[in-house]
Amino acid sequence: MSGNPGGFKPRRIKGLREIAAMTARRALGGHVFSAGALGLAESADWGLARLGKLLPLRVRCPCCGYQGPSFLHVNNTKKTSWNAACPMCDSRSRHRGLSLMIPDLLRRREPHTRVLHAAPEAVLRRVIEPIAAVYHTSDLRMDGVTYPGEDLSRSRLPEASYDVFLCNHVLEHIRDDTAAVAGLARTLVPDGIAVVTIPGDFKRRETKHFDDDSFGGHWRDYGRDVLELFSKFFKVVETVDLHELDKAPGGLSHGIFPGETAFLLRGPLPQPA
């Protein structure tokens, strides 16, 4: 399975021996409490894979159609995300929310919508490409994209060429996010929209900055002050609560977390030459 969430590939369920070995290694590395959470999350996934058909349906993935009693649990040294990853397509809460929001967004625009998708995830590509007039992609390291080797903070993308720019959990990986947001704005037509999701706690005022990107490639964990950054480059900054899209048919849940937020950045502002 690809390490990139949303790769439209089933997640591999680990065996009990592998879980025990992983847990021991983390504990010996000094992360004792995190090791316990890892063992619990992976063991719960192991049990779900074997007993899930006996349990009542509670969730449905809008990206691939999976239905089951729960999504899988994802753990790292910082936290555990319960009921997070689809076992069939590896979508996360943000992918599932965007897969429901973006089609409606595109339908509201003119029929010839040109979309640029940074660091494209297969689960979202399957949703967007069929309904976009033009669907292009960019990435710094990924092969098979329209614009390979593209660093948004040193953008070489064509200016004023796209109607919608999707940037899903990308900015936190870029050291100079101010330059990256400027790059988003330059790429859009005057009435264009950037759809941005980022990790953070938006009840917290300030963004937490890290000394390096050793935590999953992240340079920061955003706070509400990101709105000030967006407002430097866009006329309108809209906050969308994706959790409002959580209800699936039959009383099921799409597994879209409370607080799952997307930002719609409308109308790029002119930038100095």
Sequence positions of predicted segments:
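Membrane-proximal basic amphipathic "stem/tether" segments
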Residues: M1-R58
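Short beta-strand micro-motifs in enzyme catalytic cores
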Residues: L57, W82-A85, G259-F263
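Short cysteine-rich clusters marking metal-coordination/redox-active sites
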Residues: C61-C64, C86-C89
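Cys/His-rich microdomains that often coordinate metals
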Residues: Q67-G68, S93, A122
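Short linker/helix segments within small regulatory modules
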Residues: L72-N83
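Conserved alpha-helix/loop element of class I SAM-dependent methyltransferases that forms part
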Residues: A85, S91-H112
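Conserved SAM-binding loop
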Residues: R109-K208, G216-F233, A262-P272
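Core SAM-dependent methyltransferase catalytic element
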Residues: K235, V240-A273
